[in-house]
């Protein structure tokens, strides 16, 4: 496929137009009084959402140049979303403002390299100022406030998320699922460990109506080995049968003679038994089996390295639990060893050290999951509603609120509603520049810092943003904010208008870094659509770019 190179004023104009259109679509969702956006689907009804990231990634211009620019911006938004799961809307508003201001000084003939240095210098000063403004999140009420703000003012969502954090702890797992019921939001708590492995045979089911395996006071046998033959298991199975208690086997796999014999004994009523595959793979499986052993009190995880063999196991070597619930997809161990016992706490400390020492985001995520299973259990937020559109829109807000809450617990909070960024202006007043063009870059960031609060106030139906900003800066009180819910000034922390520092920090960082990339972007190479393609863009000179008709 042939391609072409787009440079100069044509490229700059295209960047400005794409950024403006993206900001219009995404920016309208900002704040508690932000609007929704409908996203059409190839099949089914359009999806209605206030999730800025979802809106951003759904925009695919027909024009190849516009698409290339939009993809660069969407990639940065994706990285922002991956880091904190929120802040995409703020990132979009800031990016658009910086690029708009840069285009003005570029047209005036400023040295763009010096301007870029000024922008990046201002960025570092703002990030430091934000850190000095933070306050730790300690109470359940503060957690609820953060979640409520991120859920666009939905207090029910904020309260439920705070309830989840209280129940499973700051390291606990909280997940979001769609519910088939009409109840808007409900919390389901799992006390214990849950992993994504179900029963190996439906013949193990004890509750045929719900297709569940349900055991009370079972023994738990753990092994890293694959079980093919029944002979090594016979001694411990005989002891289990005499005890009258059920048995759960967690192994790499159970198949062949071993599986068929277990199923046969279960069907004949001689043994209450079930088998599941061990969670994870490779070394991670070994670690997770070790976690289960600690949590259930099992003395051994049978493997080739141990001196003790399967045939030598006694009932005292096995783990135990109050209850076990197994579906075709998950296994939940409930009421095992007390999470506060010394062995469990020692394991938790060990995993925390591994998280601190890990350099891989993927490894950290998996270690965090292990930590959560050991320390806090699992809480599930079940989102319901009267229609699929309603459920999906609410689920988006719940997920955003959950991400924001985690960020707030991790790094603390700052005044919300765009006020935190506004108050960092003072950090730029005394910032020294090498020359006039570098000062232009600093001034660009100053104007960009006012963009989020202006947009939030605009979305609330007011054009009074300049007066609001002037009043906030005049008071010299960095806890003062403008609450658009009541259209009046208030204290950020007493009114609950707060944002997670991590979300604000990363959104600003990514926005300015992305804008800096566009500052020095001199050319884009794009493919020319084939003649059979109905694309709006032609091959010669990108005709039709004016007004971005390709959107």
UniProtKB/Swiss-Prot annotation:
Report the top EC class in one word: isomerase
Q: What start and end residues bound the annotated signal peptide?
A: none
> Which superkingdom does the taxonomy of this entry point to?
Bacteria
The UniProt entry, under CDD domains, shows: GroEL (cd03344)
Q: What is its EC number?
A: 5.6.1.7
Q: Which GO terms describe its biological process?
A: protein refolding
Q: Name one GO molecular function term.
A: ATP-dependent protein folding chaperone
Q: Where is this protein found?
A: Cytoplasm
Q: Name one GO cellular component term.
A: cytoplasm
Q: What is its main location?
A: cytoplasm
Going by the UniProt record, its keywords in alphabetical order are: ATP-binding, Chaperone, Cytoplasm, Isomerase, Nucleotide-binding
**One protein family per Pfam:** Cpn60_TCP1
Q: Which reaction does it catalyse?
A: ATP + H2O + a folded polypeptide = ADP + phosphate + an unfolded polypeptide
Chain residues that bind ATP: 29-32, 50, 86-90, 417, 499
On subunit structure and binding partners, the annotation says: Forms a cylinder of 14 subunits composed of two heptameric rings stacked back-to-back. Interacts with the co-chaperonin GroES.
Q: Which HAMAP family match?
A: CH60
Q: Which NCBIfam families match?
A: GroEL (TIGR02348), PRK00013.1 (NF000592), PRK12849.1 (NF009487), PRK12850.1 (NF009488), PRK12851.1 (NF009489)
Q: What does this protein do?
A: Together with its co-chaperonin GroES, plays an essential role in assisting protein folding. The GroEL-GroES system forms a nano-cage that allows encapsulation of the non-native substrate proteins and provides a physical environment optimized to promote and accelerate protein folding.
Q: Which family does it belong to?
A: Belongs to the chaperonin (HSP60) family.
Query: What's the protein here called?
Result: Chaperonin GroEL
């Amino acid at each position: 496929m042939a391609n072409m190179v787009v440079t100069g004023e044509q490229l700059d104009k295209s960047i400005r137009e794409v950024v403006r259109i993206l900001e219009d679509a995404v920016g309208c969702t900002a704040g508690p009084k932000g609007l929704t956006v409908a996203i059409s689907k190839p099949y089914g009804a359009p999806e209605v959402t206030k999730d800025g990231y979802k809106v951003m990634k759904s925009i695919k211009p027909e024009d190849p140049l516009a698409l290339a620019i939009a993809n660069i911006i969407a990639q940065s938004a994706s990285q922002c979303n991956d880091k904190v799961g929120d802040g995409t809307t703020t990132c979009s508003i800031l990016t658009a403002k910086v690029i708009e201001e840069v285009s003005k000084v570029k047209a005036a003939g400023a040295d763009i390299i010096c301007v870029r240095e000024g922008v990046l210098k201002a960025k570092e000063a703002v990030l430091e100022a934000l850190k000095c403004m933070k306050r730790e999140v300690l109470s359940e009420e503060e957690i609820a406030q953060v979640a409520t703000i991120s859920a666009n003012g939905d207090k029910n969502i904020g309260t439920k998320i705070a309830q989840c954090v209280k129940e499973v702890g700051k390291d606990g797992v909280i997940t979001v699922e769609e519910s088939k019921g009409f109840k808007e939001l409900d919390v389901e708590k799992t006390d214990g460990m849950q992993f994504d492995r179900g029963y190996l045979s439906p013949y193990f089911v004890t509750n045929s109506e719900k297709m569940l395996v349900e055991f009370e006071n079972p023994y738990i046998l753990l092994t890293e080995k694959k079980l093919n033959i029944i002979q090594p298991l016979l001694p411990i199975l005989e002891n289990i049968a005499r005890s009258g208690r059920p048995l759960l086997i967690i192994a790499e796999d159970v198949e062949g003679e071993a599986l068929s014999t277990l199923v046969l004994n279960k069907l004949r009523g001689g043994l209450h038994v079930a088998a599941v595959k061990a969670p994870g793979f490779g070394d991670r499986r070994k670690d997770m089996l070790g976690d289960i052993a600690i949590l259930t009190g099992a003395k051994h995880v049978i493997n080739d390295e141990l001196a003790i063999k399967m045939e030598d196991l006694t009932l005292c070597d096995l783990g135990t639990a109050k209850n076990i619930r197994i579906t075709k997809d998950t296994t939940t161990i409930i009421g095992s060893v007390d999470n506060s016992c010394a062995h469990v706490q020692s394991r938790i400390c060990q995993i925390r050290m591994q998280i601190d020492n890990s350099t891989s985001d993927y490894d950290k995520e998996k270690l965090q999951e292990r930590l959560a299973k050991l320390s806090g259990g699992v809480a599930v937020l079940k989102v319901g509603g009267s229609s699929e559109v309603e459920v999906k829109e609410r689920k988006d807000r719940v997920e955003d609120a959950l991400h924001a809450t985690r960020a707030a617990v991790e790094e603390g909070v700052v005044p919300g509603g765009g006020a935190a960024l506004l108050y960092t202006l003072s950090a730029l007043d005394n910032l020294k520049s090498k020359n006039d063009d570098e000062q232009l870059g600093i001034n660009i960031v100053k104007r960009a810092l006012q963009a989020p609060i202006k947009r939030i106030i605009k979305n609330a139906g007011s054009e009074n943003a300049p007066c609001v900003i002037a009043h906030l800066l005049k008071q010299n009180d960095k806890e003062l904010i403008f609450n658009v819910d009541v259209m009046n000034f208030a204290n950020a922390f007493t009114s609950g208008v707060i944002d997670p520092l991590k979300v604000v920090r990363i959104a600003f960082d990514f926005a300015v870094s992305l804008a800096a990339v566009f500052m020095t972007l001199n050319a884009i190479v794009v493919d020319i659509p084939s003649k059979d393609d109905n694309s709006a863009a032609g091959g010669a000179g990108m005709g039709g770019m004016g007004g971005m008709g390709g959107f």
